[in-house]
């Protein structure tokens, strides 16, 4: 059911569509069709598990930004940045993040916040769909929406969306610990770098609260180990060759050295320090490897485990063809 005072479903969809155009201009869509389809498939699977979808269509997009961020717009638009994709360590974590953003949409957090801040302009538009005649007014609304998405929606709304994301991802067959795992590794990253994910700052008093609540809810829902149904390797295989760092948005004119994410299979006898030395030429990069892979500094990698590593330069696909054993002959 649609429940935002003074706003019709059509208006809410139009608000999202207007701001979507600005986001696409501001960041650009990451040009990797296979990865876009992969994220969209996970997102649409989550939407299919909702008891009430609220909106007829949902869109999931990776935007070309090195910021660590995910955000949603009214009407069914969900975005994750390249920076966030690089931080995520399993499909279950990504499902938790996408489910959280779907929560913002179905609870109308963005639209309600807009009504509180610029309700009079939205009311003046009524149900009018964007057209050249009222383009100026729509621009005001979509600009305000664009500015607000990065500010988060306050403690209650974030926890409500965390819960929705955990429930939704579990219904879609994922470990409910994905969300808390992602929040924990993000907190480690933020403590190191001071970078923040929307409404999730290391200095924010509610950060630990969110991690604890997400972990408790997941624990109540599942008696399995934390890494059950995480689909970590499946996610990491998709990530190989992902552009790393680079521009924050279209206004970022700095020259960025090309870097990408590679996937390394741990060998017998490897430690994080030895991998850092062997693969990156600097054993002090071991901390970077543990943080990026959501691991505690005190832990050690296990043989056969896959790890993300950052490499300089542009990604080159394997030169060798992977021939599958015993190919099935075509039916005559």
Question: Where are these predicted regions, by residue range?
Answer:
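Extracytoplasmic and endomembrane cell-envelope/extracellular-matrix remodeling and assembly machinery
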Residues: 2-8, 17, 21, 25, ...
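Active-site His/Glu-centered metal-binding helix of metallohydrolases
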Residues: 19, 98-110, 160, 164
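Acidic helix-start/capping segments at beta-turn-to-alpha-helix junctions
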Residues: 31-46, 58-65, 120-123, 182-189
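Short alpha-helical functional segments enriched in proximate histidine and acidic residues
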Residues: 46, 104-105, 168
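Catalytic zinc-binding patch centered on the HExxH motif and its immediate surroundings
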Residues: 62-76
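Short pre-active-site segment immediately N-terminal to the catalytic Zn-binding motif
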Residues: 79-96, 111, 151-156
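Catalytic Zn2+-binding segment of zinc metalloproteases
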Residues: 91-92, 102-118, 130-131
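Structural signal for membrane-spanning alpha-helices in multi-pass inner-membrane proteins
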Residues: 124-129
């Amino acid at each position: 059911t649609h429940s935002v005072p003074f706003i019709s479903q059509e208006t809410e969809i139009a608000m999202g569509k207007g701001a979507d155009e600005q986001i696409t201009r501001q960041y650009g869509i990451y040009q990797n069709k296979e990865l876009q389809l992969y994220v969209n498939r996970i997102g649409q699977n989550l939407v299919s598990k909702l008891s009430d979808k609220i909106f007829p269509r949902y869109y999931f997009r990776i935007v070309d930004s090195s910021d660590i961020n995910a955000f949603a717009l009214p009407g069914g638009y969900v975005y994750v940045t390249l920076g966030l994709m690089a931080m995520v360590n399993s499909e279950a974590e990504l499902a938790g993040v996408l489910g959280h953003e779907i929560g913002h949409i179905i609870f109308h957090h963005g639209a309600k916040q807009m009504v509180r801040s610029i309700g009079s302009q939205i009311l003046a538009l009524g149900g009018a769909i964007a057209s050249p005649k009222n383009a100026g007014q729509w621009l005001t609304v979509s600009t305000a929406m664009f500015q607000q998405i990065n500010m988060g929606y306050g403690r209650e709304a974030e926890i409500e969306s965390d819960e929705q994301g955990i429930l939704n991802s579990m219904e879609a067959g994922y470990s409910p610990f994905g969300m808390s795992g992602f929040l924990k590794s993000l907190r480690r990253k933020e403590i190191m770098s001071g970078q923040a994910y929307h409404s999730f700052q290391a200095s924010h008093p509610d950060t630990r609260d969110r991690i604890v609540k997400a972990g408790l809810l997941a624990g109540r829902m599942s008696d399995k180990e934390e890494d059950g149904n995480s689909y970590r390797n499946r996610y990491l295989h998709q990530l190989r060759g992902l552009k790393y760092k680079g521009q924050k948005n279209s206004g970022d004119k700095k020259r960025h050295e090309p870097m990408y994410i590679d996937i390394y299979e741990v060998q017998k006898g490897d430690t994080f320090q030895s991998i850092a030395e062997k693969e990156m030429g600097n054993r002090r990069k071991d901390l970077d490897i543990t943080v990026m892979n959501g691991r505690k500094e005190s832990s050690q990698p296990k043989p056969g485990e896959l790890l993300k590593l950052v490499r300089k330069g542009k990604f080159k696909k394997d030169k060798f063809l992977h021939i599958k054993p015993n190919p099935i002959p075509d039916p005559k």
